């Protein structure tokens, strides 16, 4: 005859079998309840868009879709510095940077395996133009690049060695010099070598006026807000929200400026290591979607469709001589030409330091 202890054990096992759900249901419940973690590395400029709008909206979206909470650990800094940190071991699952050249460096390091340009708009998630910020009332009478190059005008932009935004700034100045050379008073465009010389001259005269080169675009704006400088060269979207909030300066969009596009990509090696590839891919897809795009637009970015950017609905000024990186040969060519060891901007800075 079974003992009383054996009888009790049998009763307990029967109770557990009745009360516990099937294994598959139980594991699904645990998975739905778990908190996933995503590490985001971004350039400094769009911090407010992410922290105030995009990240909370994505967390809500992911919760509704999967039942899971997602915690986003975000890091913001100069684009080039962020790219180097990722290559050096900062294990970000998603990189949102200022320029495609920084993403390409991560690709070359073997950390991004997929073709990130196959995403909508070639992998770009936001757009802007390089603009000039001036003091309220424009006391220096700045209307364009030549005015920023006048003696006695103090200019700010960050350091291209650390800041992707600064690279855009310098490219805008150089490209503007080429555009200006194509419309001389005589009506005949300058020869290529003459246009190049004029572009270098404009770059030299503006660089001579640069008071401080901060590490990032955001630091440069902070310096300008402290009262340093007459003109800041920066993203238009850095200036628009501040003017809207009654900051004491104005925006000048030069006729000659560059069309800016900013990329985002999953960092495959780290996302796979953390087992969050699904979350990372969903986050990047969310950045291309209407909710994130509306947040970018609200904070001064332009629509990725340049035609829409000039529509009456968005009311962005349309520069008459807007140009793109592609017109200057693409990122690989222009970055080497301007910022390489023997680059034009590099030589300008070195020559000015000797004087």
Language model regions located:
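Short beta-strand->loop
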Residues: 41-44, 134-135, 153-195, 206-210
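Bacterial N-terminal signal peptides
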Residues: 11-25
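N-terminal secretory signal peptides that target proteins for export/translocation
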Residues: 1-8
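Extracellular/periplasmic juxtamembrane helices and adjacent flexible linkers that interface
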Residues: 271-355
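Periplasmic-binding protein-like
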Residues: 124-129, 200-207, 214, 245-277, ...
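N-terminal segment of the mature folded domain
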Residues: 33-163, 349, 353-354
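Boundary at the C-terminal end of the N-terminal hydrophobic targeting segment
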Residues: 27-32
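Ligand-binding pocket segment of bilobal, Venus flytrap-like solute-binding proteins
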Residues: 180-254
């Amino acid at each position: 005859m079974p003992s009383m202890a054996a009888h009790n054990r049998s009763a307990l096992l029967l109770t557990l079998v009745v009360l516990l759900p099937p294994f598959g249901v139980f594991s699904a419940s645990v998975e739905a309840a778990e908190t996933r973690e995503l590490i985001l590395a971004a350039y400094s400029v769009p911090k407010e868009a992410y922290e105030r709008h995009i990240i909370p909206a994505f967390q809500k979206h992911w919760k509704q879709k999967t039942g899971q909470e997602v915690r986003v650990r975000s890091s913001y800094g100069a684009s080039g510095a962020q790219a180097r940190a990722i290559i050096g071991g900062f294990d970000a699952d998603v990189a949102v940077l200022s320029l495609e050249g920084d993403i390409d460096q991560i690709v070359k390091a073997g950390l991004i395996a997929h073709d990130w340009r196959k995403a909508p708009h070639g992998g770009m998630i936001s757009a802007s133009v390089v603009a000039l910020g001036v003091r309220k009332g424009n006391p220096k009478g700045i209307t364009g690049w030549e005015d920023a190059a006048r003696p006695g005008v103090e200019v700010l932009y960050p350091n291209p060695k650390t800041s992707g935004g600064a690279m855009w700034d310098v490219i805008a100045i150089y490209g503007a010099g080429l555009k200006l050379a194509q419309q001389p008073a005589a009506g005949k465009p300058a020869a290529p070598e003459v246009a190049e010389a004029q572009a270098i001259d404009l770059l030299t005269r503006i660089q001579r006026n640069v008071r401080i080169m901060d590490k990032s675009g955001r630091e440069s704006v902070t310096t300008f807000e402290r009262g340093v400088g007459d003109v800041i060269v920066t993203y238009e979207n850095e200036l628009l929200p501040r003017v809207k909030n009654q900051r004491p300066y104005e925006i000048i969009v030069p006729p000659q400026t560059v069309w800016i596009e900013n990329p985002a990509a999953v960092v495959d090696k780290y996302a796979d290591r953390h087992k969050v590839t699904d979350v990372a891919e969903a986050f990047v897809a969310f950045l291309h979607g209407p909710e994130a795009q509306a947040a970018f637009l609200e904070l001064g970015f332009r629509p990725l469709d340049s035609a829409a950017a000039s529509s009456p609905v968005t009311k962005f000024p349309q520069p008459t001589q807007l140009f793109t990186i592609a017109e200057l040969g693409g990122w690989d060519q222009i970055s080497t030409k301007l910022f390489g060891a023997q680059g034009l901007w590099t030589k300008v800075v070195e020559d000015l330091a000797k004087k």
